[in-house]
Design a protein with these regions (language model features):
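Sensor-1/coupling segment of RecA-like P-loop NTPase cores
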Residues: 61-65, 74-105
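Conserved NTP-binding/hydrolysis module of P-loop NTPases
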Residues: 2-3, 12-30, 41-44
Length: 386
């Protein structure tokens, strides 16, 4: 038997009152202002061979004020071992769990059986869930929603990418941006500072520390501290020495397209906003997501995968297998791979003195015939859709 409880953001006494009210509505006998022990006794019931699972959602609200609930829960489970009850505590506040919870609960942490962080789902899972959508559409939607299946449920795969983005983010009744803003305000204390840094990084010309310093006016030391916090929350990552990117797709889209144009976003209709501020720049936005999808596939195939910067700001992957073989990987995206692309790759590899045993090209629209004749047998072409 599975029992669910979603904790509200209120005092411990109010939580006991509300949970007790829920239990009374289910026909249980419990006092109007029950203690935690009364609540747990009522939930677990009498001794039975039937196992029960209690799932408490948003459990961080139970602990941020004080740790009394956790103390009572641990004591109850130890004193009533005859009750077959498994308690699972869940929360979306992963940053608080990783950075603050242990210091908050102290030695009580030793009574927790384990921690499990649920990662975002890979692109391949999205393809399996939506097999009818084209590969191009899946890539463009994954670029915004990332690997969060809760957001995937909101998609209408029969509609275009533009129509989905307009409905989910740009219409007056769109709730997702406000949900994200609320989540950020709960995770980050000085939101004005963090918003400034995230907006700066989202403009991909300013991903370097010096560029952030020039644009924000914050000291390099201050920027470094806030970047460290953002990386701990897995919102930002260092992709190259001194170069940072927003790693959360949802937040990256918001700070790239919506945050810099607040007035127009709130004022204009969705389609007009898309045409003015998103359409022209969206392919560049998607290319970064495509690179991440390629990286995800490569990490499953090779021992090490490292992003390298070459001439003219071009980046490539250098992979090594378990035998030490070096493989250079270019990712052209959804366009046809040409002889010019291959020549640029060769020039870039020479500029950084990179000698490779093999070359892999990720492309979703094939390659020109002239290139096939020119490099016959030297290249391996792959698609993220396979």
């Amino acid at each position: 038997q599975t029992i669910r409880y979603t904790a509200p953001n209120c005092s411990s006494r109010e939580m006991c009152y509300q949970w007790g009210q829920e239990l009374r509505e289910q026909g249980k006998e419990i006092s109007r202002y029950p203690s935690w022990e009364e609540v747990l006794q009522c939930v677990s019931g009498e001794k039975s061979d039937r196992k029960k699972v209690l799932i408490i959602e948003n459990f961080h609200y139970l602990l941020k004020g004080d740790t009394f609930f956790l103390q009572e829960l641990i004591r109850y489970l130890k004193e009533h071992r005859e009750v077959s009850l498994l308690v699972i505590l869940t929360t979306y506040a992963s940053g608080w769990v990783e950075n603050s919870m242990i210091s908050k609960i102290g030695n009580l942490a030793f009574s927790v059986s384990g921690f499990l962080k649920v990662k975002e789902l890979p692109f391949s899972v999205m393809r399996r869930i939506f097999p009818g959508g084209t590969l191009q559409k899946s890539i463009e939607l994954y670029a915004v929603l990332g690997g969060m299946p809760g957001l995937w449920k909101l998609l209408e795969m029969s509609a275009s990418v533009e129509e989905n983005l307009t409905t989910l983010f740009l219409e007056k009744n769109s709730f997702l941006p406000e949900l994200m803003i609320k989540w950020l305000s709960e995770e980050l204390r000085e939101t004005a500072v963090y918003n400034t840094i995230l907006a700066t990084i989202a403009d991909e010309k300013n991903g370097k520390l010096n560029a952030m310093y020039a644009r924000t006016g914050f000291s390099r030391a201050k920027i470094s501290v806030y970047l460290k916090n953002l990386m701990e929350l897995e919102l930002v990552e260092k992709v190259l020495p001194g170069t940072y990117e927003i790693s959360n797709s949802f937040i990256r889209f918001y700070f790239r397209f919506l945050f810099p144009h607040q007035t127009a976003w709130r004022r204009d209709n969705g389609r007009a906003f898309y045409e003015t501020y998103i359409r022209e720049d969206y392919s560049s936005f998607v290319r970064t997501a495509y690179r991440r999808i390629c990286q995800e596939i490569l990490q499953a195939d090779f021992h090490t995968v490292e992003l390298k910067k070459a001439a003219q700001w071009r980046t490539y992957f250098l992979c090594k297998d378990t035998a030490g073989k070096k493989i250079a990987v270019d990712y052209s995206g959804t366009v046809c791979y040409t002889s010019e692309d291959y020549d640029a790759l060769q020039t870039a590899l020479k500029s950084i003195r990179m000698e490779t045993d093999e070359i892999i090209i990720f492309c979703e629209n094939g390659y020109e015939n002239a290139l096939a004749e020119k490099v016959s047998g030297k290249l391996q072409f792959r698609s993220v859709g396979v």
